[in-house]
Amino acid sequence: SVDITLAAAQSADIVSAQVNSHMPRTLGRSFVHVNDVDVIVEHDEELLTIGATADSQQANIIAKHIARLVDDGSTIQIGLGTTPQAVMLALSGKNDLGIHTQFLTDEVMHLVARGVITNRRKGVNEGKIIASTAIGSKSLYEFMHDNPGIELYPSDYVNNPAVIAQHNKMVSMNVAMTIDLSGQVAADALPSNLFSGLTGMLDFVRGAAQAENGKSILMLPSTNRNGKRSRIVTVLADTAVVIPRSDVSYVVTEYGAVNLFGKSLQERAVALISIAHPDFRDQLFHEAKNAGLLSRDRSLAESLQGIYPVQLEETVEINGQELVIRPATPVDTRRIQEHFYALDGKDVVSRFFYEKTRFNLEEIEGVSQIDYVNDLTLLALVGDPGFRRVVGIGEFLFDPAKNLAEVAFSISKEFQGKGIGKILIRKLGAAARDNGIAGFIAYTSHKNESMIKLFNSLPFTIK
């Protein structure tokens, strides 16, 4: 560990050093000159090692969500624990990742062996893994010994936000203990047990935010270990705030990922409730209303009780442009509204059967706030994560009396005729079958040739 050890050695009145042949020799700024040491003790002993943590289904699901947010060529920083370990395993399909992190672990070594971590596209210290501390197995220490591809530096360099911000696609990934509905994060201690001291988490959160195409991701299970307490709370109490709400962007639980950047307090509350454990959403909703985070007239949408169907997510490429297909969430209300306003008059009539000129938020909430079973809305989006815009919508609303669902679609003009409608109806059909729905009903004008052609192209019986 170079971390703060080098600074301590440079500042201390008396410096004692142990010479241990088991200690790996690392490059970088990890040396103390013998003339600066007052006492030398020669003593060999095994180094502290830690093994792999127990497998966790929660951690594996969170890891899959996070892996979708990490692009090829990203430089990553990641914390310690079960979930970060699962995240590193989930990144095994990526290419040309780089490492600039506090903690070097066995998972980094494994990704280097697989060729996932190359450090070729970092922008700073290219070709080098940069860290300040290593903790892992004996194999990790052997891997580090005299390895020219690994350099250790003190915390004043590794944790410097200005240095972190110089990296290409810098992604910080850290574990939060608790987050409140405004976005304030507690991460370093339990109430009344403030033993862990300061962390470097905020340094990486801010450095990643300043980096070009950088991202800050916070991960946490939705509940504590016994499932009796939500880790998403209305207001943090008796707990130190490690990350202010103004610095928080992506938050990920096993129930999904949300981006809080640029969101109002009400939008933040809705977003975080949507990824809380379903058993606590009702309580959080009513507490948020009482705390003034949600307006009094807001109702508890069914989507806050539904389980987000992550299996319906898909990324496709159309004419060289990446499109993300995914179910709508409560925080999509504004972008769905913007999509409808961007439609031309003809497309508005095709979708709503009259010249509709106003799309009130109350109406749009019926599209974005869904239960994913009786009603489902799929969105096609383009753009960077957190700033994507809707270019296509496919939705169904279930009629239990007929065991049929009514479907409707709208596609932005520049994306019409590119197959988005087929993708949306294929995924809607698969979801409907899984939910036991017998078929679809669609109402359209006889002049809407593109919609008629779409339905006739499907491998379904058309009546």
What does each of the following model-derived ranges do?
Residues V87, N125, P161, G200, ...:
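Flexible domain-boundary/linker segments
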Residues I307-K463:
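Long, contiguous binding/interaction regions
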Residues T53, D297-T315:
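Long, charged amphipathic helices and adjacent flexible linkers at domain junctions
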Residues S1-S299:
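Conserved phosphate- and dinucleotide-binding cores of soluble alpha/beta proteins
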